Amino acid sequence: MMENNNSAFSYNLTKLDLIDNSGKAWNLIPGVQAITYYESICDPYVSANIRILDSGESVINKIVGGEEVHMSVGGPDEVEYHYILMVYMVGDRSVSNKIQTYNIGLISAESLTNESMKISKSLTGRPDEIAKKILEDENIIKTEKDIFTTPCQNNTKIHPNGKSPFTVINSLCNGSLAAIKSNVKGSDSSETTTKDKSLGGSAGYVFFENRKGYHFKSIDSLCDVKGEFGGGGEIRTFIDSAEGGVNEDSIINVNFESEINLIHALRLGTYSSQLQTYDISSGKFEVYTYNLSKEWDNQSHLGSQTKLNPIQKKLSEQPTRILSTIVDHEKYYNGTDTADPDDP
């Protein structure tokens, strides 16, 4: 039987019911050996694993997959948290002396819907609006959970080609640019000549789910300690957790695999990089240059560093990574006449 209040955080499991296909609720608490709950900013779902020791009624015989599990947990802040997850897996089953143990895998209901849905229709607009539309559309995910987004300043058009909804949203993350503190501007000339432009702002979003709902947020907003990039302006550090006492936001362990590697950073173009594009329809060749020294103040930063040191400024002077790609503005134009390459 699971022992409640067995951790420093004093979490209480107050409810754990499995609803079978007939609608009957089965209390799983007496047989629970362990529960592991997972959230990650890299995953568009929450999941859990329950280890069951079953010596009485064989609950496993009632499970066929897709059942709801209602879970309530009392936290150290004296607030009760409620979760409704779906059974997607039963495994690691063993039987000995009329006692069987097994794992029940739980996941968000939307994740099961995601696996059964494919999107083929082209989607146009701001990435954050596209993500929200996919999640709310009654013909796609149709979630009733809250959705939190950081507004994007760029528009895009995506051709999913039968990809799953979550895959489509994840594909928008790298090319999404937050509207706050961005200096990217459209082209102001139709000349088919080389133009060197400064690429500003900080691209990069993450799509994930936690107990509050779905998030399509810019990395800058998540790292925002000053409230300048759409974030809350509050970051809880490991030191805060150690000195601030026990609560639901306490960080109990931190592992840094790699912190500083200048060679790796230079090869990735962390300090300065260049993007070269060639439009095969218009013949226009453009060059976009990213320089960390110029863009430092347009980004949010974690840690104690408030400015670049001399060597970092020097490493920002020349692009250390050059990327090139072929584009075709006609591909994203819906009209019947010739598209204007300078019309966003």
Locations of regions flagged by a protein language model:
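N-terminal export/assembly leaders
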Residues: 47, 114, 131-160
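Assembly/oligomerization scaffold segments
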Residues: 1-116
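Stable alpha-helical elements in mature extracytoplasmic
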Residues: 126-131, 165-169
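PEST-like low-complexity, intrinsically disordered acidic/proline/serine-rich tracts
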Residues: 118-120
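Short beta-strand-centered interaction patches in the first periplasmic/extracellular domains
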Residues: 101-104, 108-110, 147-273, 278-280, ...
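An acidic/polar, Gly/Ser/Thr-rich interaction patch typically located in mid-to-C-terminal regions
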Residues: 34-62, 239-344
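Short alpha-helical segments in extracytoplasmic peptidoglycan/chitin-binding modules
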Residues: 134, 172, 323
